[in-house]
Structure formats: structure tokens, C-alpha cells
């Protein structure tokens, strides 16, 4: 399985890198993708990460899952990216995997793809998970079908 981790300036470094590390240890292929037109993406704490791919060089036919790390203003940049929104909607239509952490599930809520699905997010972001069954008692790792 190939996972594309979407990075935008202001992403939360630990949310991106810890997930990437766990996925790689589980033998997933993980590619970092800068949604901007630059390879180095600055995290919320100004740590620069060199992305494997930039948006224009990304082939989503090679991807099985899109993962969105949270962080501010990174989550807002993800929300504002029209191309990413289109890819997320297409993945949802195809029943492909979509994952997000902390504030980033709000991107899915804004696209209306959480209707009738269980979701969890950073406290205070529940109002952005439009249509979701908010389940704060879920564990940190949850798979909902």
C-alpha cells in the first residue's frame, strides 16, 4: 500500500513524522507531497522537511491512501487547495483510504464526505466535521467503514 502524506507550510511536525515512521515500520510505502510549488515545507515549529514529491509531480493513480497531518496554519492551507479537494473527493467516490489527524479531519468535513461516518478530531474542531457521528471516546487509532 502506498500512502501520500500531504504537507503544507504550518503542518504539525510530530503528527506527520510519527505517522510516517509507524507506517514505514509496518512496510507501507510512504511519500511526502508538498502541496505547494516547492520541495521544502516548513512545519508549525519551523522545521523544514524536504518532500518526496511536489503537487505537480504527483500521480494519484499510484496512491492507495491520502493522509493529512494537522497543525495550523497547515490545515487551513490543505483546506484551501482546490486540487487536493478534488483528489479527496475522488478517493471518497472510489472507496479509497483517507486519513487525518488532529485538526485535519475538518478538511474532510468541509468537503461533506463524513456524512454518517464516525470521526474524532482535536477538541474544539467538532463543529467542522459536518455530518459526522462525533465519537470522542474512540481510541487514537480508529478505522471506520
Where are these regions (language model features)?
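Hydrophobic residues within alpha-helices
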Residues: 18-19, 87
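Flexible gly/pro-rich beta->alpha loop and the following alpha-helix that scaffold active-site loops
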Residues: 31-96
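Extreme N-terminal starter segment of soluble prokaryotic enzymes
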Residues: 1-4
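Conserved small/polar residues in nucleotide/adenosyl-binding loops
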Residues: 141-145
